[in-house]
Curated annotation (Swiss-Prot):
Reaction(s) catalysed (UniProt annotation): [protein]-peptidylproline (omega=180) = [protein]-peptidylproline (omega=0)
NCBIfam families: tig (TIGR00115)
Pfam families: FKBP_C, Trigger_C, Trigger_N
Organism of origin: Rhizorhabdus wittichii (strain DSM 6014 / CCUG 31198 / JCM 15750 / NBRC 105917 / EY 4224 / RW1)
EC number: 5.2.1.8
GO cellular component: cytoplasm
Protein name in the entry: Trigger factor
GO molecular function, one term: peptidyl-prolyl cis-trans isomerase activity
Subcellular locations according to the entry: Cytoplasm
Amino acid sequence: MQTVETLNEGLKRAYTVTIPANDVAQRVEAEIKSIAPQVRMPGFRPGKVPANLIKKMHGPAIEQDVLNKTVQDGVQQLLAEQKLRPAMQPSVELVGGDYEPGKDVALKVELEVLPDVPPPAIEGLKLERLSVEAPTDEIDAQIKRIADQQKRYDDAKDGHPAVEGDLVVLDFAGSVDGVAFEGGTGTGMSVELGSGRLIPGFEDQLEGIKKGESRSLNVTFPKDYGEKSLAGKAAVFEVTATDVRVPGETKVDDEFAQSLGLQGLDQLRELIKGQVEQELNGLTRTHMKRKLLDQLAAGHDFPVPPSMVEAEFGQIWAQLEHEATHEEDPEAARAEMEKDRDDYRAIAERRVRLGLLLSEIGQQNGVEVSAQEMQRLVQQAAMQYQPADRDRFVQYLQQDPMAAAQLRAPLYEDKVVDFLFDKAEVSDRTVTRDELEAAIEADDDTIGKGHVHGPGCGHDHHDHDHDHDHAAPAKKPAAKKAAAKPAAEEAPAAEDKPAAKKKAAVKTEEAAEAAPAPKKAPAKKAAAAKAEEAPAAAPKKAPAKKKAAAE
């Protein structure tokens, strides 16, 4: 194989690679011999079909397969001989277009290489850890929230008119144009006024109703109502309130905690305190990590492959486009995005540079994700799928190294960050939640924040065509879907009663709901904030495109 370098400019490289026709011919003959035992042809015993007949019948397909493999091997040999580390999938073209049997194979190979990352300066890092003690009032508020979710109702006084929050128990009979319809009649249905569970206007017309009172409710089914025969139609419901109940106050005590499957109130408080502390510790780490990356970015400046920056920018932009579609005014959101296009490109460049830097730090210092850690990641990810699909998901990861790299990358990055935390000089300061959140928000406002993006991060820099959609094979199992909202919540149903309280199961569900949800950042800030949470890893060798030979 002959190699001629045609471009060496910055990180860009280009080569002409010539593979002698004799090498291809020898590979074709070897392939024919290897498949001959499996070829079946009328008139010949199995494995005894002459090579010339095999070539006559299957020659073009064999030559194409051999050519593809020859091109891949040629590119691999080029990368090894020239000691190249591709940033992205090399571009491989046949010089002159189609391959002609009997002639040399001439390839044009173009690529960008990873830069030589300068020795990372990781000595003398100084970080401040902003810590927040779990506030008692926040713990109390979370417990009250749980108590409020465990609603109980007491009998209302005689003559009490139902108001929002009250529970009205109804017998009902619905009709359209005077004709009863299926599912429109029932008894003992409980309706919490103001819950919005029933069709528009139904609950509103129950306000003020008293026990024993009957009313006629005029409503219109929504045009997108699940039962097509009722969609958009006007209906009349004759209802009678058989009972009106008022919310009772849930007393927060040992008995309440025991109803959740706990030993007592002290255990509930400890459980909630632990959840609040976990969330606050996460905020502390987020702030520290961003400050760490700021120092690394400020102390290291080296060229990064434009193709990696462009691919990273494409991902950022796609995420912003997705978020814009959910804004009240998508066009205005897109216009705002366009104003900041250059800023987002700067974010992309920072991501790539930090990714390469963290990857280098991890490799130099022996940071690894162990087989046991990877196994736990796979098991956790598999739980997102239906039980019947979990084995297929695991097989998918085993067959697709890039999918496995995507799964592994965040943990690898966290381990590199933890390594740097251990090396840094860390000072502690106790602050309030508001002060910590304000510090994080100030980071969000800083242009240039971005998740770190390096080789092996799950974005394919050189192992396949880099289109960044990362679509899984057709047989990749689908993730679990949320259960559809039952039709009973859109119209009265005979058996629509409040669910009974759960005991032990409530323990984890209520505790999970007790933790406050993080505030949602505006689209621009969210894109920058998310930046600090992505992966870096070591580069891999790059096979050539299989389709290159056919192009």
